[in-house]
Amino acid sequence: MARHTRIAGITVGQSPRTDMTCDLVQRLADNLELVEYGALDGMTLEQVESELKPEPSEEVLVSRMSDGRQATFSGDKVVPLVQAKIDQAEADGCRAIIVLCTGSFPELRHTVPLIFPQPLLHSNARALAGGRRVAVMVPDPSQIEQAREWWSMSGVEVDIVSASPYQGIDGVTRAAATLKGADDAFLCLDCMGFTLAMRDAARRASGLDVLLPRTLVASVVSELLG
């Protein structure tokens, strides 16, 4: 079937995100074409670290620069850049927009469906857990307390570990191994940067079933527009 419906994928880092889209495209319906946008496109890592440095009270996000380096920055300060990419994607004729980040976002201006992974991940995890505790992996230790707060607001008790998807699969495997034998319903990899290969490695190391947001989001979008 020919691809004819354009959808936007907006990373809070830089595009293209070939490390992410390879898994996403596999799960998208055949008629969907993914067009990439990056909130940090055109910026250097030094600019990001200087201009978007998180204040103590601000949400911390972790993403990837186009050269593969990890970038850590303020979720609050990146919001206007994400909004600009939403506006651009709509002007380019995209039929729907996925924000490729599991962080929390305020209400943003849009005229086409705007999909945020966090509510999809949290609601599915809550339904699947059936009241049991859920293991969660975030990229950076600085995100643990904010993640605990977000999951608590969604009614889910969590057991949190950290490992960056941008620093290789070994760290993910080691962090997942610390969950071996834990009384958790399953493991959520709480970042769009985690790959299918990392999901499989985490499953082997932890002995837990694993929920991966990038494939969950792709499945939902395909159901909606495929």
Which residue ranges define each predicted feature?
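Short gly/pro/ser/thr-enriched loop/turn and capping motifs at secondary-structure boundaries
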Residues: 42, 121-124, 143-144, 217-221
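N-terminal glycine-rich phosphate/adenylate-binding segment common to multiple enzyme folds
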Residues: 72-118, 185-199
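Structural motif
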Residues: 46, 80, 165-177
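Hydrophobic alpha-helical
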Residues: 96-99, 171-172, 183-206, 213, ...
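Short, flexible loop segments at boundaries between secondary-structure elements
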Residues: 130-131, 167-168, 210-226
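Anion-binding alpha/beta catalytic cores of soluble intermediary-metabolism enzymes, centered on
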Residues: 107-132, 136-141
